[in-house]
Amino acid sequence: MADNMTTTQIEVGPGATNATINFEAGILECYERLSWQRALDYPGQDRLNRLKRKLESRIKTHNKSEPESKRMSLEERKAIGVKMMKVLLFMNPSAGIEGFEPYCMKNSSTSNCPNCNWTDYPPTPGKCLDDIEEEPENVDDPTEIVLRDMNNKDARQKIKEEVNTQKEGKFRLAIKRDIRNVVSLRVLVNGTFLKHPNGYKSLSTLHRLNAYDQSGRLVAKLVATDDLTVEDEEDGHRILNSLFERFDEGHSKPIRAAETAVGVLSQFGQEHRLSPEEGDN
């Protein structure tokens, strides 16, 4: 990329564009079928909705550049995409996709793909749908704040000091609230800070927020989506403040992670992300 930060657009050709759109439509079909089986969690539902919006927009744009006879709807592309998956996963050319053939079938003599047969590969042991959890991504040198037997004023000040010393870029902030040596709250926050010319730092993106109960069980989580991404620094401060304010409400009993999660979720009108059991906690 040049020093002036200009972007070079590379045209990959209409064939590759169609193949990509159709394949993503097939992925959307799989997401929807998984959702119908009630096997899709809240982050997965977010991805489904986001993918559908983006595909509808991309198809609308792409169809404008195609002759009317070649324009296809999302539903038509879903059917083609599912067939493409059969070809890719089972190396079954009988699935019949005009103009699409796996590269390793055309180049079997030079391919590293063993016999081009993936159907005999066993599934990963112990990995079922319900076993796969998304944790905050790894960040080098994460900042961890432990608040032991502090009054609310001191706890708030320590959090602000740690947040304000963050370097530019991604960060991971672990907050543990200890009251009388009882860990009552543990929250992991992932985000990205921006450094401004005047030296001021602001939270530009909230990537993920996990809340845990006293036993370490994940009771609620936020995963960044289009409508949860922070658009400006004021939103960033509001989001963090809504979390930190949970320390300042003066509860006589320990603050609970589920209550904190509900408080943060309510800032976005996203309470539906919690299961009924979590919402009642």
UniProtKB/Swiss-Prot annotation:
Task: Cite the residue spans of the region called G1P2-binding.
Answer: 1-103
Q: Where in the cell is it found?
A: Host cytoplasm; Host nucleus
Gene Ontology molecular function, alphabetical: protein serine/threonine kinase inhibitor activity; RNA binding
Q: Which UniProt keywords apply?
A: Host cytoplasm, Host nucleus, Host-virus interaction, Inhibition of host innate immune response by virus, Inhibition of host interferon signaling pathway by virus, Inhibition of host ISG15 by virus, Inhibition of host PKR by virus, Interferon antiviral system evasion, RNA-binding, Viral immunoevasion
Identify the residue span(s) of motif Nuclear localization signal: 50-55
Residues of the region (RNA-binding and homodimerization) are 1-93
One GO biological process term: symbiont-mediated suppression of host type I interferon-mediated signaling pathway
Stored InterPro entries: NS1, uS15_NS1_RNA-bd_sf
Q: From which domain of life does this come?
A: Viruses
One Pfam family, short name: Flu_B_NS1
UniProt keyword annotation of Acetylation present:
no
Q: Under the cellular component aspect of Gene Ontology, which terms does the record hold?
A: host cell cytoplasm; host cell nucleus
Family of the protein in this entry: Belongs to the influenza B viruses NS1 family.
This molecule's function is given as: Binds and inhibits the conjugation of the ubiquitin-like G1P2/ISG15 protein to its target proteins. Since G1P2/ISG15 is an early antiviral protein, NS1 may inhibit the host antiviral response. Prevents EIF2AK2/PKR activation, either by binding double strand RNA or by interacting directly with EIF2AK2/PKR. Also binds poly(A) and U6 snRNA.
Complexes and interactors: Homodimer. Interacts with and inhibits human G1P2 conjugation by UBE1L.
Q: What is this protein called?
A: Non-structural protein 1
**In which organism is this protein found?**
Influenza B virus (strain B/Maryland/1959)
Gene name in the database record: NS
